[in-house]
Amino acid sequence: MSTTIADQSPAVPSPVEAALARLPRVVDLLAARAEEHDRDATFPYQGIEAVHEAGLLTLTVDRRYGGPGGSLADTVQVLAQLGRGDASVAVVTAFTLLQHAEQARTANWPTAGYRRLLTESRRGPALVNTLYVEPGGRSGEPPSTLARWDGTGWRLTGRKTYCTGAEALAWMAVTARTDEPEPRTGTFLVRGESEGLEVDPTWDQLGLRASASHDVVLDEVRVPAELALGLNPSKGGTGKGATGSAARPGGASAAGVVPAAELARAWHDLALSAVAVGVARSAQDWLVRFLHQRTPANLTEPLGSLPRYRSALGEIEAQLIGAEELVHGLAPRVDRAEPDAVARTGPAHLLATRAAISAVQQAVSLTGNPGLSRRHPLERYLRDVLSSRVHLAPDEAVLEAAGRAALDRGARH
């Protein structure tokens, strides 16, 4: 059989494949600047620009909007690698990717508003996040932020806290309740440069210091009527935001159809898990170099030659393998909307985060003083991975939901 020239031509990579191929260079750039941004608590604009230029910031824009149509499996792969470079950049990127993925599934944004976001995304990084956490607020309560109708649009007044990427957000999806006699709760799409909007630089945390997760203060910020989404009677809080994750009910509906909110939560859980595991992998990489290079005065061989250290490193490797198998194994199943997989992402988030934290803590324990020195990145990895818990529901809530689901299954058999 003859072979034509066309048969020998290399396959043209898809937009997703092309973006993934640019990941290593981006990760190297992020790692080179991460210590500086962590030390000074400055937002990593250059790093976000690199993520954007590589096509990674819009990876989950749906094909019907002209985007790559990246899946959750693609997303966790990207975020795990970005987490190796700079956890703050990875977390900021995660929330923008989650917004585009939500639009791909639900088309909640009005067409004109989303087109505007995509136009901005072609010109440069256009970060988006949901702002729902409020000072003193409790999960399940309606938001305190008020929306007042002025005759042609809405005026928003209130304060949101822990708003990841606050100073650089192009758009903010702000949860609020109306001041009507029978209040409604919804999400209002707010431009980051809106008049009456102020970023209060309150973020001064142990880890993720470059994420600019500041407070956002809204004072009569005007929102056009068409940018108010999902206004429903106020029976409780809505949405999820930059920090925090409510426990999901124990499984999908009886008909096997996964509710949109459950899919959104599954994406959130696995995306943030991937970042934490990526940070832990960087800690392990540093530990491996340390064990190869460190030869105490009372030894003639590096620490890595000792069975004790090899065994401890093996324990770290086993934990991270387990976490990666959970995250990367569940992601394609969530892409297929398998109810059982979606229901497992809450416990998977808990287990992956625990494994990542334990792995980095063990690495610090093995290295002693050098691991806690600001001259080395290991202590930053520890602070960042500990801070990953802010994106996780309380352990008891996750485990209680998982236990309830197990009891429900038992009652059906």
Residue ranges and their predicted role:
Residues 1-14, 240-245, 413:
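Actinobacteria-biased recognition of intrinsically disordered, low-complexity terminal regions
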Residues 24, 278, 314, 318-321, ...:
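Generic structural signal for well-ordered, non-transmembrane alpha-helical segments
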Residues 31, 35-38, 321-351, 364-372:
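C-terminal helix-coil-helix/basic helical segment that borders enzyme active sites and/or dimer interfaces
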Residues 45-52, 59-164:
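Glycine-rich flavin
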Residues 48-49, 300-307, 336-353, 371-387:
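Charge-rich, acidic-biased intrinsically disordered regions
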Residues 159-199:
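A short core secondary-structure module
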Residues 205-319:
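Glycine-rich beta->alpha junctions and the first turn(s) of the following alpha-helix
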Residues 369-413:
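Glycine-rich phosphate/cofactor-binding loops in nucleotide/flavin-utilizing enzymes
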